[in-house]
Amino acid sequence: MSTVNELVNLVDETYDISQIEKEIGLDNIALSDLELLATGGYSPLTGFLGKKDYDSVVETLRLDNGSVWSIPITLPVTEEVAKSLKSGEEVKLVNGGNVYGVIQIEDIFVPDKEKEALLVYKTTDEAHPGVKKLYERPNVYVGGAIVLTKRFENNPFPSYHLDPIETREEFKKRGWKTVVGFQTRNPVHRAHEYIQKSALEIVDGLFLNPLVGETKSDDIPADVRMESYEVLLQNYYPKDRVFLSVFPAAMRYAGPREAIFHALVRKNFGCTHFIVGRDHAGVGDYYGTYEAQEIFTNFTVEELGITPLFFEHSFYCTKCEAMASTKTCPHGKEDHVILSGTKVRELLRNGEIPPSTFSRKEVVEVLIKGLKKEVVTG
């Protein structure tokens, strides 16, 4: 494992794989994890977790060496594949007929998935998308150090797909000493904009880092979201103080634990601060409104290496005639227009136009166009 904030780099496209015969098939989650492990997005991790680290992360939110890490990054294989593997050997990592990397197997073990579900997601309910995915994936985990031997060619957003070393360079070039990261899997609505701009008042730059890996089927498609971010930044943000780049990970929907994970990853991308809002990375009613903020009290800023910025739920207040939160607005609920991505999706699907207090008109236009395309192609 590398030291804090030193980036892992495990990309080697000249790596000789000609003598390696065995292979493990990667699903899309493992494939995106492979890339993020190799490019340093998941520093200090250098591979898929072995049993010791896996148990430690699941039980204590720390690696075996004590470093904070909250989400188990695992490589699941079927019992049949596991039987053909042994510790110490090198195996190719394959997806869609292409070899993307190699793993040096250190560990082959059967996890207690129920325990993982309960501790990581706080539920064993299979209606929870993270738990559902956990149970759907094969039942044996393979741990070991990896090498990425081939970069992905079919990247849907090449100009926005930057490795941590590149985003760090970009922030340096812009002279940003302090950078706040914002994680999103939804179009940015007025509530998000208010929070981002509040944070931008106290730091040099905003890093808008939308997740474009695997999400729930009813989440708005990544290409539509990317276009919505572009029009928003073009029209409503100072260009020299915002940087947009994608986060190619899968969404886990692990709420509080994922908030810690998202913060650690943004530290690797070069952020000094990270925004944690209401029900960060949550789904349904599985987590308390501010549970994702409360979990940070278990760790010091020093050991996280990044400062979390907590925001209350914001809304449009008809009396204040402005965006506000309970910290800044004295008025009652009856004056508050509550904004949420879910609400906007609902309005759009019913053919209604969200009011300008919800969403900027340029964003709404992009979403309507995207929804029409979805209906035609869907």
UniProtKB/Swiss-Prot annotation:
GO molecular function per UniProt: ATP binding; sulfate adenylyltransferase (ATP) activity
EC number: 2.7.7.4
Lineage: superkingdom: Bacteria
TM ranges: none
Broad EC category: transferase
GO biological process: hydrogen sulfide biosynthetic process; sulfate assimilation
Record flagged with keyword Nucleus: no
Assigned keywords, A-Z: ATP-binding, Nucleotide-binding, Nucleotidyltransferase, Transferase
This protein's pathway: Sulfur metabolism; hydrogen sulfide biosynthesis; sulfite from sulfate: step 1/3
InterPro entries hit by this protein: ATP-Sase_PUA-like_dom, PUA-like_sf, Rossmann-like_a/b/a_fold, SO4_adenylyltransferase_pro, Sulfurylase_cat_dom, Sulphate_adenylyltransferase
Catalysed reactions listed for this entry: sulfate + ATP + H(+) = adenosine 5'-phosphosulfate + diphosphate
SUPFAM superfamilies in UniProt: Nucleotidylyl transferase (SSF52374), PUA domain-like (SSF88697)
Entries under Pfam families matching the protein: ATP-sulfurylase (PF01747), PUA_2 (PF14306)
Family: Belongs to the sulfate adenylyltransferase family.
HAMAP family reported for this sequence: Sulf_adenylyltr
Record protein name field: Sulfate adenylyltransferase
Species annotation: Bacillus cereus (strain 03BB102)
